[in-house]
Amino acid sequence: MTCPRNVTPNSYAEPLAAPGGGERYNRNAGMYMQSGSDFNCGVMRGCGLAPSLSKRDEGGSPNLALNTYPSYLSQLDSWGDPKAAYRLEQPVGRPLSSCSYPPSVKEENVCCMYSAEKRAKSGPEAALYSHPLPESCLGEHEVPVPSYYRASPSYSALDKTPHCAGANEFEAPFEQRASLNPRTEHLESPQLGGKVSFPETPKSDSQTPSPNEIKTEQSLAGPKASPSESEKERAKTADSSPDTSDNEAKEEIKAENTTGNWLTAKSGRKKRCPYTKHQTLELEKEFLFNMYLTRERRLEISKTINLTDRQVKIWFQNRRMKLKKMNRENRIRELTSNFNFT
């Protein structure tokens, strides 16, 4: 049950003070009242207007019940006065908890109250720090405000209007911070200059070498010349190496020509048959089994001996022609051997 803020506490107390105090509806349309006899819990207990009425106190007048709790009404009066205290506006999702406490206890929903001495001290100190103070920097007797709105000491003028502070108080800290920024820039610039100047001094020392270093450099220059000479010699040998390799290749070719090779004849010309010994042996074996190959068998042979299908086909054609020629010659020999010419 929520209570509207614009309704005064006297309007809630009227139905209780009237002879028909048990009526359930208030004259104000925005408020629904329940009698204390229905429930043990108090009417408007959240707002702190009327306490719970036990069955023993039903006979008594409700005015006595209101008088026995003067702290509630006095606290409402203090809240209503904008000059006495300042209350921060909470977001919509977090309504104010209306439970009241004795005046000695401070609530978290109320802005921290600063004394005049602390305000005078915190004013100039706030200008020195651009970031808000953490929670550990707050005073011992000050209660922190919820994290959405942190009461900064620079805006602690609470005894003026409900808008925290005037325009002059807002302008003063910003002007002081702006005046401090150029100081920090001036302080940082000489530091940067000093940092840049440090590496310059070793450079000047390194640029002026000692006589001992000069001697060592001259001594090192001598050995450096020797590698260059060795590189030249290597380049000469590299230039002559192609000639030697060509000569070796020619000699190898001559040796092969004298003995003969499978692909080259003794005279050095290339043989007509491009097949190796292994390939010809495999083809001869297959030719003994079958002179004519099917396409599937031809593909299998070509894969086994690493030849194309066309090469195997041509070889078998040539082999058949060779066999035909041999048969003809043999036939002629047989015929001529039978006849003896006198």
UniProtKB/Swiss-Prot annotation:
Q: Where is this region: Disordered?
A: 1-20, 186-271
The cross-link described as Glycyl lysine isopeptide (Lys-Gly) (interchain with G-Cter in SUMO2) comes at K106, K195, K254
Which Gene Ontology BP terms does the record give? anterior/posterior pattern specification; embryonic limb morphogenesis; negative regulation of cold-induced thermogenesis; neuromuscular process; proximal/distal pattern formation; skeletal system development; spinal cord motor neuron cell fate specification
InterPro entries named in the record: HD (IPR001356), HD_metazoa (IPR020479), Homeobox_CS (IPR017970), Homeodomain-like_sf (IPR009057), HXA10/ABDB-like (IPR046333)
Top-level taxonomic group = Eukaryota
Annotated region of DNA binding = 268-327
Q: Which residues carry this modification: Phosphoserine?
A: S189
One Pfam family named in its UniProt record: Homeodomain
A single Gene Ontology CC term: nuclear body
State if DNA-binding is listed as a keyword.
yes
Q: Where is the composition biased (Polar residues)?
A: 1-11, 204-219
- Record PTM Phosphothreonine, positions in chain: T8
- What cystine linkages occur within this chain? none
User: Under the GO molecular function aspect, what terms does this record hold?
Assistant: DNA-binding transcription activator activity, RNA polymerase II-specific; RNA polymerase II transcription regulatory region sequence-specific DNA binding
| Keywords assigned by UniProt, alphabetized | Developmental protein, DNA-binding, Homeobox, Isopeptide bond, Nucleus, Phosphoprotein, Transcription, Transcription regulation, Ubl conjugation
Q: Does the keyword Transcription regulation apply?
A: yes
| Location in or out of the cell | Nucleus
Say which family it is in.
Belongs to the Abd-B homeobox family.
Function noted in UniProt: Sequence-specific transcription factor which is part of a developmental regulatory system that provides cells with specific positional identities on the anterior-posterior axis.
What protein am I looking at? Homeobox protein Hox-C10
Its ancestry begins with:
Eukaryota, Metazoa, Chordata, Craniata, Vertebrata
- Gene that codes for this? Hoxc10
